[in-house]
C-alpha cells in the first residue's frame, strides 16, 4: 500500500510538471494578469496547476472539513467545510525539484460552507450544499466575493464482490462579484461514473479501495477567464479523469476529515489542469 502511495505522489509531480511545461508553449496569449483570474475557478480548483493561454496559475489549497453529525446519528448528515487557497502566477512547479520556491503570493481566498447528506434509499444519496467567501489579489487591489450552491447526487448502479459502480451528478449555481464590478453568475452540470475496487489492504486503520472516476462538466453559458472578453479563454465544457485511494469510513485528523486522496487531470482544449484532491465534487 505504501508503494501505491509513493506511485500516486510521483504521478502527481509528473503530471504537474507536464502541465507547467505545456503553459510555456501555448500559442494563445493573455494581455494582463487580471485576464487569468476567474475567482471561482481558482478558489475551487484544488491543489495543482492550471493553464490558460500562455499563463499558468499554481494553486495550494488547504481543504478543512468536519462532520457536525453523521447519517448514523439521526438519518441526516451535516458537514462544515472551509477551503483556504493560495495562488501563484507563472510559477512552474517543476522548479521545486531544483530547490526553487515561489517568493511572492499572488492571490488568497477563503471559502467556508456547509453540506447536508440525505439518504433517499440504500442506493441513492443526495447532498445539498452552500459556500460563500472572498478572494483577494495581493499584488493589487483586485478582490471578489465568491459563492456557490447546488445539489450532489450519488446512485449505486451495481456491486459485485466489493466492487461498486455508481452514477454521480452535481448541479451547481455559482458566481463571483469583483470589486467595483457586477456579479458574474453561471451554472454547470457535472456527471460521471465512480468505480471503486477493493485492494484487500488497510491504510491507517481503514480498508482501502482504488477509485476511477471519469467526469464530464457542461457550463450552461460560456465560463470566462478573460476579463476583457478574450474568446480564447472561455469554457463551455470540461473533461476530467480522477484516480484515488479511498475508504468507506473517513480518516480524521482533528478538524480535517477526508475519505479519499487522489489526482485529477482536467482539460477543455483551451484550459488544462491537474490537481490533488481529498474529496470528489459529488
Enumerate the language-model features and the residues they cover.
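Short glycine/proline- and aromatic-enriched beta-strand/turn motifs that initiate or cap beta-hairpins
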Residues: 23-96
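Transmembrane beta-strands of outer-membrane beta-barrel pores
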Residues: 45-51, 84-92, 118, 132-138, ...
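Residues that define the transmembrane beta-barrel architecture of outer-membrane proteins
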Residues: 56-64, 76-78, 104-110, 143-149, ...
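Residues on the lipid-exposed face of transmembrane beta-strands in outer-membrane beta-barrel proteins
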Residues: 62-68, 110-118, 134, 149-157, ...
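Short loop/turn motifs that connect adjacent beta-strands in outer-membrane beta-barrel proteins
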Residues: 67-79, 118-126, 158-165, 199-210, ...
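Transmembrane beta-strands of outer-membrane beta-barrel proteins
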Residues: 78-84, 126-130, 147-149, 163-171, ...
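Outer membrane beta-barrel transmembrane domains
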Residues: 88-102, 203-282
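Detector for outer-membrane/organellar transmembrane beta-barrel domains
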Residues: 142-222
